[in-house]
């Protein structure tokens, strides 16, 4: 049954064809038929080799229409900054006590923020948070004195991205329940951020391929120009 269901979902998607962004979004939404609200993911193949330091691509983008998911945020801070984080809606706030919790393997959050003075302490968690992509970093705004702003951004649609070994960068940019216009705006915002993060060491064609998919659906390849160009309407 599962095989037949997959075959039916894949019908009408030509894996060798490149589709215009608006058409691709419609195709992906039509095929998101699971019993839950599937995440829509965009994947970009870049002409970089992240093994070289001058070809690393990473950054953060605030999606105009949010991600549609609940993001749990942990903040390492003390005193007034801890109070500000709590007031802004942080789910977990602490210092040494939070370090002990994380070291114990209890990671009940999706994003981690820290004030600069906390980094010597948070640095002990590199082996735990690093592999999960959660280590606070000033380059993506998660090491900051503006903890309230960082918490609100994280919960409001901020998405971190980092190129992987094969030169691929991807992210969930919304839900299948989003209307097509909202998804298109989010995809363009993500693509713009990746393009702006082009490293100095990148040579030749930077954006090689773009595709979108839903959690359970097939990947739909997109004409690169229809993603990187400004919409006409």
Swiss-Prot record:
InterPro entries: Ribosom_uL1_bac-type (IPR005878), Ribosomal_uL1 (IPR002143), Ribosomal_uL1-like (IPR023674), Ribosomal_uL1/biogenesis (IPR028364), Ribosomal_uL1_3-a/b-sand (IPR016095), Ribosomal_uL1_CS (IPR023673)
CDD domains given in the database record: Ribosomal_L1
UniProt key word Transport: no
One GO term describing the cellular component: cytosolic large ribosomal subunit
Pfam families on file: Ribosomal_L1
Keywords in alphabetical order: Repressor, Ribonucleoprotein, Ribosomal protein, RNA-binding, rRNA-binding, Translation regulation, tRNA-binding
A GO term for molecular function: rRNA binding
Keyword Repressor: yes
Any single biological process term in GO: regulation of translation
Subunit structure: Part of the 50S ribosomal subunit.
Family per record: Belongs to the universal ribosomal protein uL1 family.
Biological role: Binds directly to 23S rRNA. The L1 stalk is quite mobile in the ribosome, and is involved in E site tRNA release.
Name of the protein: Large ribosomal subunit protein uL1
């Amino acid at each position: 049954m599962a095989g037949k269901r997959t075959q039916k979902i894949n019908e009408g998607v030509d894996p060798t064809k490149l589709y215009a962004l608006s058409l691709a979004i419609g195709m992906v939404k039509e095929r998101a038929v699971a019993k839950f609200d599937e995440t829509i993911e965009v994947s970009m193949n870049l002409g970089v080799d992240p093994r070289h330091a001058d070809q690393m691509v990473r950054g953060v983008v605030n999606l105009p229409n949010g991600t549609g998911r609940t993001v749990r945020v942990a903040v390492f801070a003390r005193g007034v900054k801890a109070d500000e984080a709590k007031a802004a809606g942080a789910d977990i706030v602490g210092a040494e006590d939070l370090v002990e919790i994380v070291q114990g393997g209890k990671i009940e959050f999706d994003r981690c923020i820290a004030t600069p003075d906390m980094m010597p302490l948070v640095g002990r968690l590199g082996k735990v948070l690093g592999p999960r992509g959660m280590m606070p970093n000033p380059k993506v705004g998660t090491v900051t004195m503006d903890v309230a702003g960082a918490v609100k951004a994280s919960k409001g649609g901020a998405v971190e991205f980092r190129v992987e070994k094969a030169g691929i960068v991807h992210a969930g940019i919304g839900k299948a329940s989003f209307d097509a216009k909202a998804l298109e705006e989010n995809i363009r915002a993500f693509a713009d951020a990746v393009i702006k993060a082009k490293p100095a060491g990148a040579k030749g064609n930077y954006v090689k391929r773009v595709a979108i998919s839903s959690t359970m659906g097939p990947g739909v390849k997109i004409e690169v120009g229809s993603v990187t160009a400004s919409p006409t309407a």
